[in-house]
Amino acid sequence: EIHERLVGSEMCIRDSPETYEFLKDDTVHNYVATFYAQFDAQFTAEMYAALKKQGMTLPELVTLASFVQEEAGNSQDSNVAQVFRNRLAEGSPYPRLQSNTSSHVQSDADNNYLWNWVAPYYGGWDDIPENILAAYDTYSCTGLPAGPISNPGLAAIKAALEPQPDEEAKNAYFFVTDLKGNYYYAHTLAEHNANCKTAAAVNKNLKN
C-alpha cells in the first residue's frame, strides 16, 4: 500500500475513497475492479469533457485534487483549488504549489506526505532518493508533483476540475489557516505575511 502511494500509481488515481463490502476470501482483482468501477461511475462524461477542454489529464487532475483534499475541508475546497490553479496558470509568478502537505518543512510533519510516508518507506529522510524528493517536494518542483499524495474524494475532484471560489480567493496565490479552522487568502506576499501574523495571533490566544 505504501509503495502504491509513493509512485502515484493508477491505483491512487482511480481508487475512490468510499466504504466497500467484500467477502472475506475475495480476490485482489475484484477489490481493484470494484474501486475502478466506483470511480468510473462517479466521473461523468461531462467531467471528462471539461477535463479535455482544459487540456488536463486524469492523473494531473487527481494529483491536484489530492492536494485540495489534504489542505481543505469541503467548504474550502473550491477556494484552495483556485489558489493552486492560479499558481499553476501560465505566466504565474509563483509556479510551485508550496504546500506543506508534501514538503521538506519538518514542522508540519503531522500532515506531510514526504515525512509520514516517503521517509519511513526509505528508512529515514536522509535516505530518500534525490529524484523522489525532487518529484514530490512542492517547494522545489515547478508545477504539479509526480503523482497524488492521497486518494481524493469526489468533492475535491470536482473542486479541482471546476472551482467556484469566493471573491477573496479568485485572484489569490497564498493561503494560511489558524487553529480555529479559519482560512486567510492573499494575492501578494505582503498580504500573506500579514495574514500569517493574524493566524499566529489567533493560535497564540488559543494556547494561553
Question: Where would I find each of the regions flagged by the language model?
Answer:
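Positively charged, low-complexity/disordered segments
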Residues: 1-8
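Bacterial extracytoplasmic/cell-wall-associated proteins, especially those involved in peptidoglycan
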Residues: 9-10, 14-208
